[in-house]
């Protein structure tokens, strides 16, 4: 609460509430959990702003892609800078996400969600010894396991559908390849390609499968594929036309694109509105493109 109180002045300039920084921090772990964490914000308007913008901070499903691309394309000096430059690039990506969150919050305050920021009154309760058992139970059972089970329930069917699309052929090409060719012009227009867009679409249920799906499409294996080393991954991607600029574009698109299905379901549950769920989908998608 003290951190939120200290940052309230900054967030108030964007028309948001200081407690939004806490839901953003939860979003770094899981955006669905971050959306649920927005319940701590009392003002309905500011709570809705926090819910809509929570996806603009990278979750643990998007961090692996960002980290591996930074390691593959920014560690090329052969010196101690190979550890510093990727770390700086990841930090910059996170800062872009935080900046986008504040910018979108400001725009929402001036357009769809007009209003005056509420007052943040910090109450200091008496210090008490933490109830370790209760905290562990709440964190593991009520939150972590619940979110993981819900994510697994959505991701498993998506993996099966992706496998089918990659193994059902129309002519000499699979349906997945036909779809990638169809999306190729749009992908090229934003510095990506059709296969990258297909991978992100396939990753709608779970962002963790974006890179395996992309490698599957590039290598035409018909099964989710992993890579043996960073060097082998870089060679695969560069042989398919990737450059450092492509890697930067993919990292930014991963940061800013639409929420995963679990997050959208959570937004629908928290807001009870299809309109605001659609807004939470279309706003980051528009920013990403």
Segments from the language model and where they lie:
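Selected transmembrane alpha-helices and immediately adjacent juxtamembrane segments
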Residues: 1-6, 86-200, 278-289
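Juxtamembrane inter-helical linkers in multi-pass membrane proteins
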Residues: 2-36, 114-139, 218-232
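Membrane-interface alpha-helices
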Residues: 5-12, 46, 76-81, 276-278
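Extended, low-charge hydrophobic alpha-helical regions
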Residues: 14, 20, 34-50, 159-285
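Membrane-embedded alpha-helical segments of transport systems
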Residues: 28-34, 53-70, 91-101, 205-211, ...
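Flexible glycine/proline-rich, aromatic-decorated loop/lid segments
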Residues: 40-44, 57, 65-76, 111-121
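Transmembrane helix-loop junctions at the membrane interface of multipass transporters and ion channels
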Residues: 42, 63-89, 262-273
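Interfacial loop-to-helix junctions that mark the boundaries of transmembrane helices
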Residues: 80-93, 232-243
């Amino acid at each position: 609460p003290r951190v939120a109180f200290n940052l309230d002045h900054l967030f108030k300039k964007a028309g948001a509430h200081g407690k939004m920084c806490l839901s953003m921090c939860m979003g770094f772990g899981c955006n669905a959990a971050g959306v649920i964490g927005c319940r701590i914000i009392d003002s309905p308007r500011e709570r809705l702003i926090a819910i809509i913008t929570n996806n603009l901070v990278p979750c643990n499903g998007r961090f692996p892609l960002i980290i591996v691309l930074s390691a593959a394309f920014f560690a090329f000096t052969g010196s101690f800078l190979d550890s510093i430059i990727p770390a700086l690039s990841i930090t910059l990506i996170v800062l872009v996400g935080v900046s986008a969150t504040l910018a979108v919050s400001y725009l929402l305050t001036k357009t769809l969600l007009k209003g005056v920021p509420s007052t943040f009154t910090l109450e200091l309760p008496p210090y008490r010894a933490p109830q370790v058992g209760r905290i562990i139970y709440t964190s593991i059972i009520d939150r972590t396991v619940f979110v993981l089970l819900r994510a697994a329930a959505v991701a498993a069917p998506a993996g099966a559908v992706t496998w089918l699309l990659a193994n059902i052929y129309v002519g000499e090409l699979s349906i997945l390849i036909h779809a990638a060719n169809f999306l190729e012009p749009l992908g090229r227009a934003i510095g990506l390609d059709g296969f990258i867009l297909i991978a992100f679409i396939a990753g709608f249920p779970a962002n963790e499968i974006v890179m395996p799906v992309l490698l599957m499409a590039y290598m035409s294996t018909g099964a989710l594929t992993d890579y043996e080393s960073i060097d082998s991954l870089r060679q695969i991607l560069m042989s398919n036309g990737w450059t450092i600029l492509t890697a930067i574009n993919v990292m930014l698109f991963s940061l800013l694109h639409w929420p995963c299905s679990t997050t959208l379901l959570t937004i629908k549950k928290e807001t009870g509105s299809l309109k605001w769920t659609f807004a939470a989908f279309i706003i980051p998608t528009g920013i990403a493109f």
